Amino acid sequence: MSTTIIGFPRLGEFRELKFTTEKYFRKEISEEELLAAAKDLRAKHWNIVKEKGITEIPSNDFSHYDNFLDAAFLFNVVPASVQNLDLSDLERYFALGRGYQGEKGDVRALPMKKWFNTNYHYIVPKFEKDTQVKLAGHKIFDEFQEAKELGLNTRPVLVGPFTFLQLSDFEEGVKADDFVDSLVAAYQEVFAKLAELGATRIQLDEAALVKDLTAEEKALFLNLYNKLLADKKGLEVLLQTYFGDVRDVYADLVNLPVDAIGLDFVEGKKTLELVKGGFPADKTLYVGIVNGKNIWRNNYEKSLAVLEQIPAENIVLTSSCSLLHVPFTTANEEFEPALLNHFAFAVEKLDEIRDLDAIRNGQGSEALAANKELFATERVGENAELRARIAGLTDADYTRLPAFAEREAIQEEAFKLPALPTTTIGSFPQTKEVRAKRLAYRKGELSQKEYDAFLAETIDEWIKWQEDIDFDVLVHGEFERNDMVEYFGQNLSGYLFSKNGWVQSYGMRGVKPPIIWGDVTRLNPITVKWSSYAQSRTNKPVKGMLTGPVTILNWSFPREDISIKDSTLQIALAIKDEVLDLEAAGVKIIQIDEAALREKLPLRRSDWYEDYLDWAIPAFRLVHSTVAPDTQIHTHMCYSEFTDIIPAIDNMDADVISFEANRSNLEILDELKAKNFQTEVGPGVYDIHSPRVPNEGEIDNTIEAILAKVPSKKVWINPDCGLKTRGIPETKESLIRLVEAAKAAREKL
């Protein structure tokens, strides 16, 4: 047998790529310096994988921003507005992901969506009528050649043509079938050039095959691959899947003239059953047996039990998905050994893959013995009081009274807000000064009194600024918070926090998910101090800002020893206690963010309710079910596909919900109208994930489009997400335009 991985983290052990790229964005280094630093980082990563004994090393899994965007650039799927910018290739590439606003032009970034059921986001290309698909880039060849010069014959990785078409957008009047022939020709040209450079095998990532597929989608897949595989240009083709099983196309897949198939044996419910039903002797099976999404040690006995049931003769052991979804290494963590031994980050997962391979080959007995010992004892005890509280919950605990319509009238009278009320999602820019003060406080260089004085002064400044530009519902800015999940987790029992456990979320942005180690309870009030302080500084309502239980769970590394449902209910009770304390402190508008609600929705529709929504929605309702009718509950959701779960979202029974909608062209509005959505809505009127400031009239046009679909009495005006990562000048300029546009729209009602 041999070993490999689907992909490796690219930000670097200490987020080197992030910091270098941000220097480039700030024009502190040149394009050449950025490219040189990235080349050094790739060499370092390849060397790590090689030294760990992995026999097949991937290349082109690295990206300066996003692999899906890389594929779009490679195949010339670039809007004319960006093609025409008088910029370098790299500048145009970044313009697709970040937008561009400067002397050469003004273009908006492409949409951004969640990558399947992860917290990674991909950039969504758009096929237009004038799109000419052709081989236009060279990154995949350059990186293969780089590795070859280091003595490594790597396996290049590329998004497969089916997934590329399935996850892209199409201009009205064009469809995926229109681009099959040109896309196949472009892929075959890639094959030919790689073969010429000395490559022997290419990995085509086809994660879209693990979703429910219609007859038309299966036909598209087969049409693409029958044409593509008719001439492989001498390359072996590995068709790699992950995030689930391929039950809809397995029979077709094994009959295609591919040389190898990669399947997920971790998240694929039916993968083992499918393979036991037969796997071709002339193909290699890449067995995704080490979890690429979670950070717990692999249980070797359980993995070996699965491997023993696989009838395939030619096997390569691999990760269940790319390792970009886990942190780099545990080597830089400071946990006690008794804790650390339970964790495997990306580098340690290389060891696990190698160990499993060795054990199967009659070696590795010491590794197996150590692993058995690790799993021989209970890792953590139970909180009996918490378990009893959950067991005692009844239907009434999940039901808020009175019903929405009655609450809406009560709140209208209580708050007396104007039509189209304005607010923001919660956070304001975290400047270098804010971060430096927090760090100094953590290090003990700043006293509690000094730190509190700084936070109070900063909150005062932003409360006054919001009043000055005439916002209707204010926020305190969240300057005391580092991360919307970590901040809460630090005040909950059962949580652990890594020092350097960064994971890429989008572009160069990393998140550091906490680890749910044991049962979760609230230790102390978390947000009451600063939310109530901010409310005391103004007569306007100030929103209390909380992270919801499903998002806290989804943006953490969850336990594997209890169900995620039970873990979420534990978190929900902790956040419920916080909601009630905020209300008691006089905070009458409370936002409970569920930014990641859609994220862990099963990829197959048949699993949506039983496996997820039937407990995720009640968990949210549990949090706010006992607040008074004149307390207004808001929630917020980030980049995801929401249109297919609108009724479930309405059933959360919040009073107001804000969506990301601007970057995806307000697509959700038609569905809100069709489903008679009852909750008041704030479909973000400008995209904060791009540094560009909306043009004069841009927000006005967006509001006009919203009001064409949603009754004005139901509409709130807000950005599409929090402003933590933006600069102060662009934030203030954008928000002033937002308030002006809202006032102008009111006059037209």
Curated annotation (Swiss-Prot):
Cross-referenced NCBIfam families: met_syn_B12ind (TIGR01371), PRK05222.1 (NF003556)
Coiled-coil blocks: none
Signal sequence range: none
Catalytic reactions of this protein: 5-methyltetrahydropteroyltri-L-glutamate + L-homocysteine = tetrahydropteroyltri-L-glutamate + L-methionine
Active site: H689
GO biological process, one term: methylation
Cofactor(s) listed in the protein's UniProt record: Zn(2+)
Upper classification of the organism: Bacteria, Bacillati, Bacillota, Bacilli, Lactobacillales
Keywords carried by this UniProt record: Amino-acid biosynthesis, Metal-binding, Methionine biosynthesis, Methyltransferase, Repeat, Transferase, Zinc
Primary role: Catalyzes the transfer of a methyl group from 5-methyltetrahydrofolate to homocysteine resulting in methionine formation.
Binding site for 5-methyltetrahydropteroyltri-L-glutamate: R15, E16, L17, K18, K114, W555, E599
Pathway: Amino-acid biosynthesis; L-methionine biosynthesis via de novo pathway; L-methionine from L-homocysteine (MetE route): step 1/1
Binding residues for L-methionine: I425, G426, S427, E478, D593
Protein name: 5-methyltetrahydropteroyltriglutamate--homocysteine methyltransferase
Recorded GO MF terms: 5-methyltetrahydropteroyltriglutamate-homocysteine S-methyltransferase activity; zinc ion binding
Cofactor remark from the record: Binds 1 zinc ion per subunit.
EC number: 2.1.1.14
Residues reported to bind L-homocysteine: I425, G426, S427, E478, D593
Family indicated by similarity: Belongs to the vitamin-B12 independent methionine synthase family.
Source organism of this protein record: Streptococcus pneumoniae serotype 4 (strain ATCC BAA-334 / TIGR4)
Binding annotation for Zn(2+): H636, C638, E660, C721
